[in-house]
């Protein structure tokens, strides 16, 4: 990937980075373990971003 990225691409990559985190422990407690994991988790090697 190029070193110089456009602002739109940077914003999309930043959003994807934030979205890729696990859900917080307090969410599991608050929902009585109804929500256990983040279904949107993505591994950089397995899945490509359509950015």
Swiss-Prot record:
GO terms for cellular component: cytosolic large ribosomal subunit. The keyword Disulfide bond does not apply. Gene3D superfamilies: Ribosomal protein L39e. GO terms for biological process: translation. It comes from the Archaea. Keywords: Ribonucleoprotein, Ribosomal protein. It holds the Pfam family Ribosomal_L39. One of its GO terms (molecular function) is structural constituent of ribosome. InterPro entries: Ribosomal_eL39, Ribosomal_eL39_CS, Ribosomal_eL39_dom_sf. SUPFAM superfamilies: Ribosomal protein L39e. Transmembrane segments: none annotated. Belongs to the eukaryotic ribosomal protein eL39 family. NCBIfam families: PRK01242.1. Binds specifically to a region in 26S rRNA near the subunit interface. This is Large ribosomal subunit protein eL39. It comes from Sulfolobus acidocaldarius (strain ATCC 33909 / DSM 639 / JCM 8929 / NBRC 15157 / NCIMB 11770).
